[in-house]
């Protein structure tokens, strides 16, 4: 069906990059994957939908560019039309642990991170309403808390990109209800939250279990980020009592988190067992706090980042690994549960770690263990990981559930093939982010609460362009041309808002400008 489109900008400015920039990729994806699995937008309309919706990227790294467009092509497949509006799915095929319309809340925050860069805002509006007001009497959807989430923080981050205050403030009471529900379900007497690893979407972890009630860096980071976001939204709504209440919650959680989750012996944020002792393993979830700017710039927390490039820590050819490789329980299992978090590389975790790394490089005084070069290496590994060897021997962009971090084989997929239970469950799995990492990390558009454009690239190419980016009701173009001979728009870094140049630098460096 043809879909009418709703745009933030009143009129689209002239494009620097034509749609032919990516049309051949779309045609390639159709040839590679002729299964015609999709939701509301059929493959026959994929190019038109992408042309009308996505930021257009051109850069010298053709494989990164190819994966960027593949991820948008795949994201589109997961937009499902229901009698109550649009939802996003994780799996294209039905799974038993989903709720209505095959929806699952586990990767909700990542769905919002990606979708905030679409020009049609209805998808996320409907999707958020489904989870926050789709339950009994307009309450939370009944399976929403099946998994931990950072929804309030994701809604705030969406506002940082689109600037739609009316939509944001309208969510406040639902987000408060969400937070209070988590408090009633998971808050412990010491002020932190507990969670089972499977309800973090991270089953078979070294530190957790399906029945144990451990204090995990994940849910406690999410709850801090949610409290902080609710306080900020309340301030915009003029509800000072709510603002003060949630500022106090956030302040208390941050101090407790840093005091209790930091293991000074391992120099890492770690899980606490029910008996109050550390689980005694560094896991990739220890980087989650930086994805939300939780750790303060003190106490040597930056030491944790040395593990990311250590082959005995998390570094691997198709990593990072989800647990440190030096631990005796680290394993890449060929038996048991298909989905294990005791070693395999998960795009879900990699997405959060790369967001965390970009935040450290932008918002902190970065430790020596994390540099733009290291960030680009890790992003390159993530890009390389998202591929599949097809029956004809060619290699195409692809994303599934988890990877063997040493071979790059999609592990759950391979195990199911071995067991003769494979049915394509994880094909084009919508459980991670990529476009948002390119836009906010590599290209460096850093969304802000004020009416300011800030760009701080982590790329080191001689040229790139990100075009038609919706931001605060405008369409942005971020263009870097070292010599001025590639795009013929002048030399240097230039930022345009609706075709009007608003910022310029001769070097590839931070720029900012008022809209």
Named regions from a protein language model:
Residues 113-116, 153-160, 225-236, 291-294, ...:
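Short glycine/serine- and small hydrophobic-enriched flexible loop segments
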Residues 14-100, 160, 165-167, 172, ...:
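Acidic/polar, glycine-enriched structural segments that form the non-catalytic walls/loops
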Residues 22-38, 45, 137-149, 165, ...:
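The feature captures the catalytic groove of carbohydrate-active enzymes
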Residues 1-7:
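Sec-dependent signal peptide recognition
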Residues 7-15:
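Hydrophobic h-region of N-terminal signal peptides that target proteins for export
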């Amino acid at each position: 069906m043809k879909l009418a489109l709703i745009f933030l900008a009143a009129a689209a400015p002239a494009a620097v990059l034509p749609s032919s920039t990516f049309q051949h990729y779309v045609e390639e994806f159709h040839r590679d994957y002729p299964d015609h699995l999709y939701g509301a937008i059929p493959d026959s309309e994929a190019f038109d939908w992408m042309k009308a919706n996505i930021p257009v990227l051109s850069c010298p790294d053709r494989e990164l560019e190819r994966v960027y467009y593949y991820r948008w092509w795949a994201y589109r497949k997961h937009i499902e039309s229901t009698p109550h509006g649009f939802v996003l799915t994780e799996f294209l095929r039905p799974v038993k642990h989903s709720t209505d319309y095959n929806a699952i809340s586990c990767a909700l925050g990542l769905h919002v991170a990606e979708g905030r860069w679409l020009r049609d805002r209805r998808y996320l509006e409907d999707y958020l309403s489904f989870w926050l007001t789709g339950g009994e009497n307009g309450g939370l959807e009944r399976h929403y808390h099946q998994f931990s989430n950072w929804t309030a923080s994701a809604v705030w981050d969406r506002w940082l990109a689109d600037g739609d205050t009316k939509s944001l403030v309208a969510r406040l009471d639902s987000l408060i209800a969400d937070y209070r529900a988590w408090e009633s379900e998971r808050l412990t007497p010491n002020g932190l939250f507990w969670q089972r690893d499977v309800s973090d979407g991270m089953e078979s972890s070294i530190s957790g279990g399906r029945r144990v009630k451990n204090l995990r860096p994940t849910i406690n980071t999410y709850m801090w980020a949610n409290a902080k976001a609710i306080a900020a939204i309340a301030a915009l709504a003029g509800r000072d009592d709510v603002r003060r209440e949630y500022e106090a919650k956030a302040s208390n959680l941050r101090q407790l988190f840093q005091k209790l989750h930091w293991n000074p012996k391992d120099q890492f944020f770690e899980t606490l067992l029910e008996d109050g002792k550390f689980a005694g393993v560094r896991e990739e979830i220890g980087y989650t706090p930086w994805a939300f700017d939780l750790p303060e710039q003190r106490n040597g927390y930056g030491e944790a980042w040395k593990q990311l490039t250590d082959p005995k820590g998390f570094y691997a050819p198709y990593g990072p690994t989800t647990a440190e490789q030096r631990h005796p329980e680290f394993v890449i299992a060929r038996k048991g549960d298909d989905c294990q978090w005791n070693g395999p590389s998960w795009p879900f975790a990699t997405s959060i770690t790369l967001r965390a790394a970009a935040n450290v490089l932008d918002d902190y005084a970065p430790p020596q263990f994390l540099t733009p070069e290291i960030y680009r290496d890790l992003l390159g590994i993530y890009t390389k990981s998202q591929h599949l060897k097809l029956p004809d021997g060619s290699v195409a962009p692809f994303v599934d559930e988890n990877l063997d971090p040493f071979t790059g084989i999609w592990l759950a997929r391979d195990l199911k093939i071995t067991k003769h239970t494979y049915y394509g469950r994880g094909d084009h799995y919508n459980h991670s982010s990529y476009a948002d990492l390119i836009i906010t990390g590599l290209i460096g558009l850093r969304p802000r609460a004020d009416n300011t454009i800030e760009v701080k690239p982590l790329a080191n190419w001689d040229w790139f362009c990100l075009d038609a980016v919706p931001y605060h009701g405008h369409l942005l173009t971020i263009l870097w041309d070292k010599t001025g001979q590639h795009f013929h728009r002048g030399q240097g870094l230039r930022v345009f808002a609706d075709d009007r140049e608003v910022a310029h630098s001769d070097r590839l460096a931070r720029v900012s400008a008022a809209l």
